[in-house]
Amino acid sequence: MSHSSTTHRDSWKSNWGFVLACIGSAVGMGNIWMFPTRVSKYGGGTFLLPYFLFVIIIGLSGVIGEMAFGRATRSGPIGAFGQAIASRGKNPKIGQAIGYLPVIGSLALAIGYSVIVGWILKYAAGSLTGSVLAQADIEGFGQAFGQMAAPFGNNFWQTVGIVITFIIMVCGISGGIEKINKIIMPLFFFLFLGLAVYMAFQPGAAEGYRYIFRIEPEGLADPMTWVFALGQAFFSLSLAGNGTLIYGSY
């Protein structure tokens, strides 16, 4: 890559903004939806023990490695893998072909997430207007969600989500992603802090906490506990995709 192509490249303006953006990249639907389900299914603390073990191991190796890879090449996955292969005296197109794999994977995730973001925006607006709670029973809520989740059932809010995302991306790293994360991530933290306080005073909370921190040796002998803990660690650290490598390149 030429010197001129890196001189005018956007970059992070603060360490704080970079850290918040990395957290925002990692803490996604895989943690908010899937993590509680797996903790409940695989024994609470029995699942958390291998999970935190994998987070430490992968964090000290994979995440740092991906970030260093992006920082060294100053490029996304296609260019980064192309440079890596070229440095070994081989055809860079081989590396570029490898780099397309995480790009295609991220595109598939983005398509699915755009639908979910549309749901979130619709429910957020409905919580302000009161329409979310307008249904009389569980069946009513189910029918309302089914209509929204049907093909073309939520086009407006899905389009709004895509437009907002596009505007943030057009504003660049420092003017878009970094700025929005400095606002959204603290709000996200206080939202979940308030939720944690609320749940602590609900009936049965003590039993739930005991379950979360209890470790059952027989559960640790189940290989699926370790398999899903490893998979969850990858989700939590946003590894093997584009995010960490691309953020490191800036």
Please describe what each predicted stretch is.
Residues 6-10, 38-42, 72-101, 114-174, ...:
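Inter-helical loop and helix-membrane interface segments of multi-pass membrane transporters/permeases
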Residues 29, 59-63, 71, 107-118, ...:
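Transmembrane alpha-helical segments of multi-pass membrane transport proteins and ion-pumping complexes
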Residues 10, 40-66, 153-154:
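Extracellular loop-to-transmembrane helix junctions
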Residues 11, 17, 44-52, 93-112, ...:
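Alpha-helical transmembrane segments and their helix-start/interface "positive-inside/aromatic belt" motifs
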Residues 20-26, 52-57, 101-112, 160-167, ...:
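Hydrophobic alpha-helical transmembrane segments of multi-pass membrane proteins
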Residues 54-63, 101-124, 187-197:
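Hydrophobic alpha-helical membrane-insertion segments
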Residues 2-12, 16, 178, 182-250:
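Membrane-embedded translocation segments of transport machinery
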Residues 14-54, 242-245:
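Transmembrane helix-boundary motif of multi-pass solute transporters/channels
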